[in-house]
Swiss-Prot record:
<comment type="similarity">
    <text>Belongs to the CemA family.</text>
</comment>
<feature type="transmembrane region" description="Helical">
    <location>
        <begin position="7"/>
        <end position="27"/>
    </location>
</feature>
<keyword id="KW-0934">Plastid</keyword>
<dbReference type="GO" id="GO:0006813">
    <property type="term" value="P:potassium ion transport"/>
</dbReference>
<keyword id="KW-0050">Antiport</keyword>
<protein>
    <recommendedName>
        <fullName>Potassium/proton antiporter CemA</fullName>
    </recommendedName>
</protein>
<dbReference type="Pfam" id="PF03040">
    <property type="entry name" value="CemA"/>
</dbReference>
<keyword id="KW-0630">Potassium</keyword>
<comment type="function">
    <text>Contributes to K(+)/H(+) antiport activity by supporting proton efflux to control proton extrusion and homeostasis in chloroplasts in a light-dependent manner to modulate photosynthesis. Prevents excessive induction of non-photochemical quenching (NPQ) under continuous-light conditions. Indirectly promotes efficient inorganic carbon uptake into chloroplasts.</text>
</comment>
<keyword id="KW-1133">Transmembrane helix</keyword>
<feature type="transmembrane region" description="Helical">
    <location>
        <begin position="106"/>
        <end position="126"/>
    </location>
</feature>
<keyword id="KW-1001">Plastid inner membrane</keyword>
<keyword id="KW-0150">Chloroplast</keyword>
<keyword id="KW-0406">Ion transport</keyword>
<keyword id="KW-0813">Transport</keyword>
<dbReference type="InterPro" id="IPR004282">
    <property type="entry name" value="CemA"/>
</dbReference>
<keyword id="KW-0633">Potassium transport</keyword>
Amino acid sequence: MTKKKALNPLPYLASIVFLPWGISLSFNKSMEPWVTNWWNTSQSETFLNDIQEKNILEGFIKLEELFLLDEMIKEYPETHIQKLRIGIHKETIQLVRMHNQDHIHIILHFSTNITCFAILSAYSILGNEELIALNSWVQEFLYNLSDTIKAFSILLLTDLCIGFHSPHAWELMIGSFYKDFGFVQNDKIISGLVSTFPVILDTILKYWIFHYLNRVSPSLVVIYHSLNE
């Protein structure tokens, strides 16, 4: 019975990692034709955020410039002008398609994220015993590691999250979050978050090292400070 319980957390952990992703991907693929059809046939209003509005305006400005060019070259042969008008018409259609596709992707990404959140919430509610077993397994695994490996792992993780190059990673993650949920990507807000998050994490880490690790494993704290120096 003990061996069975010890083996339970591994498949449970694998299901937490892969099952929400697989279900969300299947949900995304199955919903895409329906969302595309709904947006192209039933959507009567246009919702634009600042980034999308800017892109649409830039596209139409280019088309307007082509129309002005068309007016300037009326003395050209009729066949040349006809080709130019056909090209402008194709560009307009392509611009509308890109606009629609952006909105469809936002809806699908948002639905996928909600699905993942619902699945993980169900896991946390229905799999309480498995979570307890997984927590015990993780604690036992960490306990069996040497203090040197623990200190090196903490140092590596902190360098990745709050190190010198971490702002670039934070910008990518926050930008991806904004894109997935269709929010307006404000550079000032992102810059403020990138400047704030690492400082908060660094403060929490120092408090954890001082309050918890210094009491549980003083040797680990000594090794960590030695590696950090």
